[in-house]
A protein has these predicted regions:
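N-terminal Rossmann-like NAD(P)+-binding domain of SDR-like oxidoreductases, especially those catalyzing
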Residues: 1-83
Length: 83
């Protein structure tokens, strides 16, 4: 089981990656960090958010405090950047 942090996960490519990961690696935990700008839409993750292994944080990867807090609280094993 891995803990993944997916930045930009509410966009087209990021959300498809999340669905793929949940389907093929169901034991993994995923946290999506996305600022939900023009390219991201939380509704793309509606199905994924129903799963207990999926979490979401609204935030910008350029915000140092947000990123540090996510790393401190979630402690990911892998970071996948689509932001």
């Amino acid at each position: 089981m891995a803990k993944l942090l997916v930045t930009g996960g509410a966009g087209f490519i990021g959300s498809n990656f999340i669905y793929y990961q949940l389907e093929h690696h169901p034991d993994d935990q995923i946290l999506c960090l996305d600022s939900l700008t023009y390219a991201g839409n939380i509704t793309t993750l509606r199905g994924a958010m129903e799963r207990p292994a999926m979490g979401f944080v609204r935030g910008d990867i350029t915000d140092r405090e947000t990123v540090f807090a996510v790393f401190a609280d979630y402690r990911p094993d892998i970071v996948v950047n689509f932001a």
